[in-house]
Amino acid sequence: MERIKKRLVAIAAFCLMTTMVFAQGGHTVKGVVADEMGPVVGASVFEKGNVTNGTTTDFDGRFTLTVQNPNTTLVFSYIGLQTKEVALAGRTNISVNLEEDSELLEDVIVIGYGTVKKNDLTGSVAAVKADQLNKGVVTSPTDLLKGKSAGVVLTSGDGAPGSSATIRVRGGSSLKASNDPLIVIDGLPVSNDGISGTSSALSSINPSDIESFTVLKDASATAIYGSRASNGVIMITTKKGSKFDTGKPHVDVDFTSSISQNTKYVDVLNASELKALMEKTYGQASEAYGLLTDSDTDWQREIFQLAQTYEANASIRGSVGGKHNYMPYRVSLGYLNQGGTLKTSKMSRETLSANLTPTLMDEHLTISLNAKLMNMDTRFANTSAISQAVQYDPTKPVYDEHGLNGYSWWNYGRGTYDIANCNTMANQNPMALLNDKNDRSNAKRFIGNAQFDYKIHGFEDLRLNLNLGLDHTSSLGTVDVAPNTEQSFHNTKQSGSGYHTNYNQQHTDKTLEAYADYSHDFGKAFIDLMGGYSWQHFYTESFNEQYKADGTQPTASDYYLSTPLTNKTEYFLVSFFGRANFSYDNRYMITATLRRDGTSRFANNKWGLFPSVALGWNIKNEGFLRDSDALSALKLRLSYGQTGQQDLQAGDYPTLATYTMNTNQSYYVFGNQWFHPLRPDGYNADLKWETTTTWNVGLDYGFAGGRIYGSIDAYKRFTKDLLNYTPVAAGANLTNYLDANIGDLENEGVEFEINAIPVETRDWNWTVGFNVAYNKTTVTRLTTDDERPDYYGVTTGGISGGTGNTIQVHQTGQSPYSFFVYQQVYDTNGKPIEGMYVDRNGDGTINDGDKYCYQKAAPDFTYGFNTSLSFKNWTLAASAHANVGNYVYNNIASNGDLLTDLATNGFVNNRYRTAEEHNFTNFAQYFSDMYVQNASFLKLDNVTLSYRFGLKGRHSLSVFGTVQNIACLTTYKGIDPEIYSGIDNNMYPRPRTYMLGLKYNF
């Protein structure tokens, strides 16, 4: 397996080095390069002592090279194979066999502040290489990882262009603070926070520039990043040039085109069904029935469309310089134009990536210069149209020449086009919502770092490393709603004036990190010591204003709908860290790390200490197993560690006394002048780190010469000092509720991964990968008095329907985001009885005391599957993932089930198809457990078929077709069961996508 992986990497990184012929004459040599599996494609062939005169082998392993001296020596090299020198001795035709290089074949894994051989790993770490990543329409790098690693759950964003995925590594470790993993790109920790005008921070990175991912899961691997790593670390390595890329540059270009369509719609009544229900409920002679018209409009199909996406990427890589002083380089350009299936939504993105890696001072100084730039333009659709399309009367037409701005609308029949004639309690025309709102943004991002790595002359075991980084994002946007439109009438504050919004935001992270690393082999013993310092500054500035769009003068007192506001905030993080690795005889390993973090966010508890230790036993290298042919790897791992959390989602000053300027609704008059006074905010000076302690035990295994390999891990995590929003005694602070460290959380799970190569021949290759993970999270403490009978926990999970209703709760002894509902009572036919719930506490009254925790949003088990089958130049690849044990509250059904709302307040609501069957006429059953539905699913994510043309020389052409989001097996009754929050309401559907593409290399 290691051979195959290295071969694929080499073809991508080193193939087709250009022939440089010194003169018109000379001695021409032809030949073929092979290994035990056959011809070697992309092997480097050059004249010894003259690296500029070289070539590479073609797809048949053949080469042609002209030299001046017929007795010169040729050098043959290929990643994963031993370099070989062959004296020509006047020959014009030679055959060369290259042998496996076991040292080069050893995988090197990127970890925090360094790399480590895979065999020396002691922590729970998953590495995913470029050839293993997902295919299809991928706008964010993290989508490439879906289903690839056990315990790493990526819930794709909705179907909006550029939408982001929610990432959870082993379920998260907090309730109120961030549960996002730390993202590190080319050694630089970057912000995963979105800013105004962008749907995803990471969508600014071109996925085609990604070389590999490394996921750090347990605390022994993540503790080196301290307070930013409680939820795991995802390390992204981008593609770079290589010192072997000599000669003419190598160019890669690719182009893809795709069409996306929605395949499923909410099951509501059509026009004829609604008329029949209205007649049955009210009668044809009723005023309610008279509200209907004669159109037959499928509103969901009206607002959605076929969406086209185009993407093009081009890159150039090579290397300049000599043998010991050289500079590999890679520069890439990318363009993406993605249309949305919801009309008016679209996104375009341009990216530039440059990687320079000069190596100087006789290979003692290596400088890594990485820069990534992005420009993104987005048109956001008004997603309120999605929920309105479900509820709007299908007997009404889309357009009406006598309607408001040409659209049909609910009005009182007064013949005017003003707010007095608008039924502001009614639903709104979905197409008007889309077309009467113009929401656009432009975002730019720069991520760059310069890393200097110096091996001390005369003492090469000691390396000094300096990393300087900058992550800067800026955005500006406008939102326009024209005056005298339906949605401007429905806004009480606007009263038909419409509005114009301007906003801009910038976010800047600066990083300085320096460390020293000493490593040395002492015979059988190996030691690696590292210590360093980190300084990080995080700064955010934003501006927002909104004013009337009806021509009101700026000097008017009611011109501004929201006061222009500029906000600036910053914080600092200073750290000291160290790591010690020791191994003996490639059998026994120990790793210890220590990090001390200081944050400006905490007033009285600035510093936190985060240690870890891990042990590894390479059982395969023991004498009793060393000669086993069946067993290729067996390593036992045990680790313990602590990480912290200071990203509390409470701003940068939750522990400091701050003041806020009053709004227009709460200003005061002094004399004859109005003033906006400052009011003090509540704060808790004693807030401190959330601390997560993790135990992990793991086993890495391999059989049949590495053709079957994988890992098993079990872990348990304890988070203490959990942040919770808790009541404050009257007069004790400047607020009624305050953030405090009074909660605890437990998290446990098991992960299993297996990969296999069932077939590996010259013409056939078949790989299969499967992973499964179990995770359980339990809240163990929320307040200092959890046993109070009137304390049900922290409510969360707002829903549509009613006012301020929530459907989820954090409760001691239960999973976070459990559904907090009544137990529905059914008749003998299994039909729910309206307004009747089980009196669970037996007090004779139905109230909050009868609610109970029923299921949760998070799955118990997650699965991932991928396979690739190659025959000669054909490759067929597929991937799938599944969740089991996750539940979803179907808010669309709970909103559309009440028949009383069929006709109300002078307008008609469309109903969910179960409304007539349930026949709820008096009570909305928002809190019934019947709407909490099993959302377990199996999704076939994509299937790709590709063909590679065997062009001569250095040219390569591949064509491929992909179908994405192919099928979903589930019992859930909504559109899509994969909803991270667990609440299904107003979701932009994920479309099915058909894609064609080509790749050309020369």
Residue locations for each model-derived region?
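Short, solvent-exposed loop/turn motifs
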Residues: P39, Q82-E85, P189-V190, H364, ...
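Glycine-rich, aromatic-lined ligand/substrate-binding cores of catalytic
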Residues: A857-V888
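Short Gly/aromatic-enriched secondary-structure transition segments
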Residues: D267-L269, V481-P483, Q546-K548, D785-D786, ...
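Short aromatic-centered micro-motifs
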Residues: F76, I183, F582, R840, ...
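Conserved small-residue
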Residues: D252-T293, A740, I757-A857, T971
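Extracellular/periplasmic, surface-exposed regions of secreted and cell-surface proteins
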Residues: L133, D180, I210, G290, ...
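Extracytoplasmic gating/loop element in the C-terminal half of outer-membrane beta-barrel translocons
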Residues: M431, T599, T828-K831, H881-Q964
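Short, small/polar-rich motifs associated with maturation and membrane association
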Residues: M1-M361, L365-M374, N382, I447-G448, ...
